């Protein structure tokens, strides 16, 4: 994928370590009882020293207001914690359904704060706020500062929103409202790692002491090591694991060998 400033052009081939994909799936979910069972099964299978972070998102309903959405976030978080989650990731990098002009929930700081507050007062496990990219370092600082009271840490960057076209210049996804999609994978690293570095710089300056979990374009072990050396508390991968399910195992092997 050729990832440009305002658009991305889809390519059909990808090699391990450089895969970048566009995602336009909406926000589908199985019924709560189904994914609660998945969480329990996952918790039973994790090993010593591992933790299970469960990401939750509220579902807007036709005619629903902010309170309805906030309550759904909290309900999902409570069910996830009851099912065995060691930490809750509150997914705020999703469209804000209460505004006409496109923005994400994390950009609506009062709404994001209410969601985090309700979640934090619902569960006893750590709460992480998942964020997307910010237009300026100042916006990042102001948002993180205002949300810090209700979050144990931040996870960023979820994805990069772009208009996506095929190699003939036509929209890559059929249907109204799908001109823009979430771009994830290797080529988002430049943007995502810069956002993480800015978050770490504000923390080092004493703005707040919350954990910073890096995600976005971390497609190689070398990138993971670099981000951790910069000060991130943890590295998360998603697209990389689709192409390399043993990514984490290889990371641990290389780190162990380096120490030895």
Model regions and ranges:
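Glycine/Thr-rich beta-alpha phosphate-binding loop at enzyme active sites
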Residues: 92-107, 143-210, 250
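Short helix-capping segments at alpha-helix termini
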Residues: 45-47, 121-125, 149, 203-208, ...
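Active-site entrance/lid segments in N-terminal catalytic domains of soluble metabolic enzymes
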Residues: 1-146, 172-174
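Catalytic cores of alpha/beta
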Residues: 68-71, 75, 135-149, 201-205, ...
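C-terminal helical cap(s) of enzyme catalytic domains, especially alpha/beta-barrels
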Residues: 1-12, 164-181, 228-229, 234, ...
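Electropositive phosphate-/nucleotide-binding environments in soluble metabolic enzymes
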Residues: 29-33, 70, 186-193, 221, ...
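Glycine-rich phosphate-binding active-site loops on the catalytic face of alpha/beta enzymes
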Residues: 92-94, 150-163, 217-218, 224-251
């Amino acid at each position: 994928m050729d990832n440009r400033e305002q658009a991305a052009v889809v390519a059909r081939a990808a090699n391990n370590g450089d895969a970048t994909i566009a995602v336009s799936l909406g926000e589908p979910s199985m019924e709560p009882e189904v994914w609660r069972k998945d969480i329990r099964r996952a918790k039973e299978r994790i090993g010593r020293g591992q933790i299970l972070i469960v990401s939750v998102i509220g579902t807007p309903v036709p005619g629903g207001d902010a309170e309805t959405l906030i309550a759904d976030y909290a309900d999902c978080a409570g069910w996830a914690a009851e099912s065995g989650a060691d930490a809750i990731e509150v997914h705020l990098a999703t469209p804000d359904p209460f505004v006409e002009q496109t923005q994400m929930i994390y950009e609506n700081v009062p709404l994001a704060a209410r969601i985090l507050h309700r979640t934090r007062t619902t569960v006893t496990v750590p709460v992480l706020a998942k964020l997307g990219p910010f237009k300026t370092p100042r916006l990042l600082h102001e948002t993180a500062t205002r949300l810090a009271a209700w979050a144990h840490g931040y996870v960023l960057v979820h994805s990069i929103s772009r208009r996506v076209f095929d190699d003939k210049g036509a929209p890559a996804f059929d249907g109204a409202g799908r001109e823009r999609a979430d771009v994830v994978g290797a080529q988002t690293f430049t943007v995502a790692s810069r956002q993480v570095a800015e978050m770490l710089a504000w923390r080092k300056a004493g703005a707040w002491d919350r954990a910073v979990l890096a995600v976005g374009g971390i497609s190689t072990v070398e990138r993971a090591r670099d981000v951790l050396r910069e000060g991130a508390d943890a590295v998360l991968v998603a697209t990389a694991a689709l192409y390399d399910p043993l990514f984490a195992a290889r990371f641990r092997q290389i780190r162990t060998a380096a120490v030895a």
